[in-house]
Design a protein with these regions (language model features):
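Secretory targeting signatures
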Residues: 1-31, 48, 54, 61
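Alpha-helical segments with a strong preference for the paired helices of cellulosomal dockerin domains
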Residues: 33-73, 147-152, 169-178, 311, ...
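Bacterial Sec-exported substrate-binding components of ABC uptake systems
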Residues: 65-105, 207-241, 366-401
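Short helix-initiation/N-cap motifs at beta->coil->alpha
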Residues: 83-85, 135-148, 276-285
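A short, structured surface patch at a secondary-structure boundary
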Residues: 96-153, 157-168, 268
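Extracytoplasmic ligand-binding site segments that recognize negatively charged/polar headgroups
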Residues: 108, 164-170, 184-198, 231-261
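Structured C-terminal subdomain patch of bacterial secreted/periplasmic proteins
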Residues: 188-201, 210, 214, 221, ...
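Alpha-helical, coiled-coil/dimerization segments enriched in small aliphatic residues
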Residues: 251-279
Length: 401
């Protein structure tokens, strides 16, 4: 760093040391952003000088990053903790992003910052048409992308999943250290909202993130509050089915899996909440019948906005109702076996799916909810495409439209 760079950094440091400490929540206002930038920059200047002059060995900005951070202050540096718990700090705007996870791109209107997308994002181009103009890096979800295609993008950041796809041994180890790797899912209801606020702050699109969060809270908070008021003795016992596991075994969701959250947020009681050690596990149909569920909520890994073919969801429904031992449960007797597409149940559109589930469970209590209208509002406001959810897409079985 040149002498003028040191002088600028020291001048900033002196000013920052007498400023009040910033709050720990995700910054949303200009003042909060500037306050956090001040705290981070002061910390990094001290760490750099400790390493440079006192033999310190702690992590710190490089000379180039410290110069950029000082130059871009007070809008930068920006710091978040991603969903893996890793601290992410940037010192300049991110403008060349590979979106291996692209759930956030269109709703936050960040298409221009994206250079490459996973093939799964390209397949969803019916509601994300920008994806057709980007480099297809392959992969998506659990499938690995093409590393050469990622190099072709020359990214300054990769935004990927926590629970799906390659780990750091792929994205971090194979990329230059200058490439920021951020891991967020935008899937789990328990932390999707916070992830949107964090990525909005990191990419300087706080207003768009706040707009989505306000829309999300409008529906989710209302459903959860109304469901919480249902007396315990009136709550439906629900078995969550996430597919066959061979023979008479079914795979189910326990506490910590997003379908469990949907079930409980809608007022249901997950009969397998404490039965399996992991987020998902296997139980026998005889055990399911013994729980005598009032409803069965199935998750099908098909459907969504990009197809009009309901066959996979219908087959999943038939697979459950065809289990002879389950025909004696209240769920089967009262026609309360429901299937929801995972492309509807997870992701930023999930408030519409939650409304669907709540209305399935308690049609009288949630008679005023219109899940189809919520889904259409999501498409209109956050994707801005000509797409009629009443005519296209496969979201549930039986089809509630």
């Amino acid at each position: 760093m040149k002498a003028t760079g040191y002088a600028a950094a020291l001048a900033i440091l002196l000013a920052l040391l007498i400023a009040p400490a910033a709050a720990t929540a995700v910054p949303t206002t200009p003042q909060e952003i500037h306050d956090v930038a001040g705290d981070v920059l002061a910390e990094e200047i001290i760490s750099f000088m400790d390493a440079e002059y006192c033999g310190g060995r702690g992590d710190h900005f490089s000379r180039a990053d410290l110069a950029d951070a000082s130059h871009n202050f007070p809008e930068y540096p920006r710091r978040i903790t991603d969903t893996t718990g890793k601290e992410i700090t940037i010192v300049r705007p991110l403008n060349r992003i590979v979106a291996y996870n692209s759930h956030w791109v269109t709703p936050l209107h960040q298409e221009d910052k994206v250079i490459g997308v996973a093939n799964s994002g390209v397949r969803a181009a019916v509601i994300n048409p920008y994806a057709l103009e980007k480099i297809d890096i392959g992969g998506g979800g659990p499938n690995f992308p093409d590393i050469e295609k990622i190099y072709e993008c020359n990214p300054d950041a990769i935004i990927t999943y926590v629970t799906l796809g390659p780990g750091d041994d792929f994205f971090v180890d194979k990329m230059p250290s200058s490439v920021t790797v951020v891991r967020m899912d935008y899937l789990e209801p328990s932390y999707l909202r916070d992830e949107i606020l964090k990525i909005g702050y990191l990419l300087d699109c706080q207003e768009q993130a706040a707009e989505y969060v306000a829309w999300h809270d409008r529906y989710v908070d209302d459903i959860k509050q109304r469901a919480a008021a249902i007396p315990e003795d009136e709550r439906l016992k629900v078995f969550i089915d996430v597919g066959a596991s061979g023979g008479a075994d079914r795979r189910t969701a326990s506490e910590g899996q997003y379908m469990h959250a949907h079930c409980t947020d809608a007022g249901g009681v997950n009969v397998a909440a404490d039965t399996v050690a992991a987020k998902t596990g296997v139980v026998n149909t005889e055990w399911i019948a013994q729980q005598n569920p009032d409803a069965i909520l199935g998750l099908c890994y098909a459907g969504g906005y990009e197809t009009d073919d309901p066959t996979a969801l219908a087959d999943h429904h038939s697979d459950i109702t065809g289990q002879q031992i389950l025909t004696f449960t209240p769920a089967a007797k009262n026609n309360q076996v429901y299937i929801v597409s995972y492309r509807y149940a997870y992701g930023l559109q999930y408030p519409a799916a939650l409304a669907t589930i709540a209305k399935w469970f308690y049609p009288d209590r949630f008679a005023d909810l219109d899940p189809e209208a919520i889904n259409q509002e999501y498409i209109d406001r956050f994707h801005g495409v000509d797409y009629d959810v009443a005519e296209h897409g496969v979201f549930t079985y039986p089809d509630t439209r």
